[in-house]
């Protein structure tokens, strides 16, 4: 594009230049040219290029029409040449100026052309953008038209539905007005009936609340009594613990004194062994060839006596060590026997746990508690016997240890035999700790078991609170219970009532199972008492809940099928009086007044 404009401009400039030369240089005749050749003016005509000024043309024309003289021709030639040269210079200058102007115009035109091209490109880009925007607007317009059509159709459908819904609403309002009238009549009839029923329920709940308050006061009183007994038992335990600690301190002091004596005897034995080795070394040395002096017989006898004395002391020490080793072996065997007995007792406890789990029934809970109470008493006696035996055995080795160092001259020698007595004392201390742990574990288990068995009838879902009313031997049987079952439940109620006669014994057993820092298992916490007062969940307890399933359970877990339960059942048959009043927990005492009518 720029090249074409440039070429067109150059062509236009060439045309203008040709026109200018044509205007300034008219045509010269051929005769004049020949005359110039003859006159020797070929060079000037060549330089002029056929371009002559008007003066030259007039002179040539005058020379052609009227011949002149040679002198005049020579004078005219240099004037014409200088004029031509000046004219040519002027034309060259003007041409240079025109050339510069033309070049300047070309540059300006180039710049304008470049700007024009840039503007055209920007316009093309804008046109493309506008076309793209136009396409987008067209698509948006198409979508908006479609959406408008869709919304118009939906509005029509909604208008139709609105009409139908208004019609339906009118129908429903008419039906509702008819239904409300009937409902009001029914509500008036029902309110009159429900008011009387609610009043009756309110009176019944007030009665139950009064009963619960009375029971709560009784439970609080029993809780205070049990807490006092627990504090007394805790003080008793503290005194026993202090006595045991004093005995252990005495034992430790005696052990320290024995250790000191043992060290002293060991040092004496070492000194005797050194002296004996020196004497043997002196006796084994060969006599010098020339002894300076022969020892006397008195000195030799003295040395022999000293040697015999040292040998006797060593022999006594060896015998003493053997006796101590035998004693340690005997004590170890006794400790093994005691450990085996403890293991047997633990196995018995496990068997009793399994037996109690198998015999866990709500109707026979009090009998099982009696059996457990017997086993607890037996275990307490066994524990007391073990404690007495341990005390005797702990006192016996100390006395023997105090007597033996006085009787024997030498002390126990080095080795494993001398440390057997200390090991024996440590094993006995561990055994006493083990016995205490077993006592605490069994007490805790028995406490949890009593809590579980007494609260089991409360939480069992099969029974109702109205079916159970033991007290004074009278009982109202439920719909699925016969007269014999009612009498059995009444006997159980009598057993609960008779538990008050053995209040001290049962309370002492319950408090013996609780450490000083733990609350009694049967005494409910303040939160539990508050919950019972608010909700009335524990207002009544059924002791005759579904007797037939319970009998089925007794068949499945009968003591005849399980040999571990036979001794307890046999003991209960031999002592029938204990089944009604020996092991009633203290939290059952508040129940009989509530159940009596």
Swiss-Prot record:
An example Gene Ontology biological process: Golgi organization
Low complexity bias (residue ranges): 53-70
Residue ranges of the region described as Disordered: 1-80, 96-120, 390-422, 457-498, 549-576
InterPro entries noted in UniProt: GM130_C, GOLGA_cons_dom, Golgin_A
Ranges in coiled-coil conformation: 81-141, 199-255, 296-394
A GO CC annotation given for this chain: Golgi cis cisterna
Sequence ranges of Polar residues compositional bias: 38-50
Keyword Nucleotide-binding: no
A Pfam cross-reference name: GM130_C
Biased composition (Basic and acidic residues): 100-120, 553-563
Keywords, in A-Z order: Coiled coil
Residue stretches of biased makeup (Gly residues): 470-483
Family as reported in the entry's similarity comment: Belongs to the GOLGA8 family.
PANTHER family to which the protein is assigned, alphabetical: GOLGIN SUBFAMILY A MEMBER 8C-RELATED, GOLGIN SUBFAMILY A MEMBER-RELATED
Identification of the protein by name: Golgin subfamily A member 8C
């Amino acid at each position: 594009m720029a090249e074409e404009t440039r070429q067109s401009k150059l062509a236009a400039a060439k045309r203008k230049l040709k026109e200018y030369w044509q205007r300034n240089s008219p045509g010269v005749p051929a005769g004049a040219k020949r005359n110039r050749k003859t006159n020797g003016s070929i060079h000037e005509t060549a330089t002029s290029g056929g371009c002559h000024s008007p003066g030259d043309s007039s002179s040539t024309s005058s020379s052609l029409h009227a011949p002149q003289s040679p002198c005049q021709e020579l004078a005219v030639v240099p004037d014409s040449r200088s004029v031509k040269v000046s004219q040519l210079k002027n034309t060259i200058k003007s041409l240079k100026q025109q050339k510069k102007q033309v070049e300047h115009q070309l540059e300006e035109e180039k710049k304008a052309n470049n700007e024009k091209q840039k503007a055209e490109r920007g316009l093309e880009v804008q046109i493309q953008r506008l076309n793209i925007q136009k396409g987008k607007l067209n698509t948006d317009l198409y979508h908006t038209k479609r959406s408008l059509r869709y919304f118009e159709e939906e509005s029509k459908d909604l208008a139709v539905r609105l009409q139908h819904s208004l019609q339906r609403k009118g129908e429903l309002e008419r039906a509702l007005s008819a239904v409300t009238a009937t409902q009001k009549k029914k509500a008036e009839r029902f309110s009159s009936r429900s008011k009387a029923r609610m009043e009756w329920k309110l009176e019944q709940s007030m009665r139950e609340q009064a009963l619960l308050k009375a029971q709560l006061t009784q439970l609080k009183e029993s809780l205070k009594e049990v807490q006092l007994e627990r504090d007394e038992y805790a003080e008793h335990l503290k005194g026993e613990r202090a006595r045991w600690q004093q005995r252990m301190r005495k034992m430790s002091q005696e052990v320290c004194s024995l250790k000191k004596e043992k060290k002293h005897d060991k040092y004496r034995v070492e000194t005797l062994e050194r002296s004996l080795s020196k004497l043997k070394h002196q006796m084994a040395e060969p006599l010098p060839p020339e002894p300076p002096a022969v020892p006397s017989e008195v000195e030799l006898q003295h040395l022999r006596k000293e040697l015999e004395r040292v040998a006797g002391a060593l022999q006594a020490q060896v015998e003493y060590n053997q006796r101590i080793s035998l004693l340690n072996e005997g004590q170890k065997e006794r400790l093994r026997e005691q450990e085996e007995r403890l293991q047997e007792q633990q196995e018995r406890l496990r068997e009793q746990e399994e037996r109690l789990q198998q015999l866990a029934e709500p109707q026979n809970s009090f009998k099982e508690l009696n059996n457990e109470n017997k086993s607890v008493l037996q275990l307490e006696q066994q524990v007391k016997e073990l404690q007495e035996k341990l005390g005797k055995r702990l006192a016996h080795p100390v006395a023997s240890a105090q007597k033996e160092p006085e009787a024997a001259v030498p002390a126990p020698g080095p080795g494993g035999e001398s440390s057997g007595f200390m090991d024996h004392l440590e094993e006995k201390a561990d055994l006493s700790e083990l016995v205490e742990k077993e006592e605490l574990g069994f007490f805790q288990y028995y406490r949890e078991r009593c809590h579980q068995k007494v609260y089991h009838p409360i939480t069992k879902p099969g029974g109702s609170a109205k079916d159970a009313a033991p007290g004074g031997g009278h009982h109202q049987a439920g719909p699925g219970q016969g007269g014999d079952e009612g009498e059995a439940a009444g006997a159980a109620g009598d057993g609960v009532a008779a538990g008050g006669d053995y209040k001290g014994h049962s309370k002492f057993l319950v408090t013996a199972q609780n450490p000083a820092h733990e609350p009694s298992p049967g005494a409910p916490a303040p939160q539990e008492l508050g919950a019972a007062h608010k909700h009335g969940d524990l207002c009544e307890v059924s002791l005759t809940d579904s007797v037939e399933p319970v009998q089925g359970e007794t068949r499945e877990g009968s003591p005849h099928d399980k040999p571990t339960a036979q001794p307890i059942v046999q003991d209960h048959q031999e002592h029938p009086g204990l089944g009604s009043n020996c092991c009633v927990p203290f939290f059952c005492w508040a129940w009989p007044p509530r159940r009596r009518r």
